Amino acid sequence: DVYKRQAWEMTDMFNLKAIEVIARSLRDAVENKPEGREGMALGQYLTGMGFSNCGLGIVHSMAHGLGALYDTPHGVANAIILPTVMEYNAPCTGTKFKDIAIAMGVEGVENMTQEEYRKAAVDAVKKLSADVGIPADLKAIVKEEDLGFLSESAFADACCPGNPRDT
């Protein structure tokens, strides 16, 4: 939500802090450690403060369809879709992926080119997802015959217009 069309300084502050807290807490939360669960509670609150003031994008639009059709938990659906959508949206994000990479705990970001820190941010998201057992792509849950419905429902979803890159 850091790079949505309506994002601004305040929403970036909330969302980047949420990314930082979630990146450091999710693994422990999955292991049911109290400090991880507490961190995730804070992270979801912070990101809620961010996206409630700037909206959401195509990741959430697509996740809604997966939840409706396959009963995929919303967080899992978002995590599966997020890296691909990050790559798609990267040309419209300026330097925001640099901030995301830093929030995800990537080291050496200050010395990276734009292409390198964008890739590092996406790779950090992929690693976090893999570490907690999230499937790497939609093939794990989506049937090919459902792609038409999923595509149509994503474009019709209220979150779609908030995407920073036209869809």
Predicted stretch roles:
Residues D1-C54:
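Carboxylate- and glycine-rich phosphate/diphosphate-binding segment that chelates Mg2+/Mn2+
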Residues D1-M10, T95-A103, A130-G133:
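A glycine/threonine-rich phosphate-anchoring loop and its flanking beta-alpha core
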Residues E9-E20, L56, V76, P91-G94, ...:
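Alpha-helix N-cap/helix-start motif at coil-to-helix transitions, marked by capping-box chemistry
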Residues R27-G39, K98-G105, V109-E116:
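C-terminal helix-coil-helix/basic helical segment that borders enzyme active sites and/or dimer interfaces
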Residues Y45-N78, D157-P161:
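Glycine-rich phosphate/pyrophosphate-binding beta-alpha loops
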Residues G65-M104:
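Catalytic phosphate/nucleotide-handling subdomain of diverse soluble enzymes
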Residues F97, E107-T167:
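C-terminal charged capping/lid subdomain of soluble metabolic enzymes
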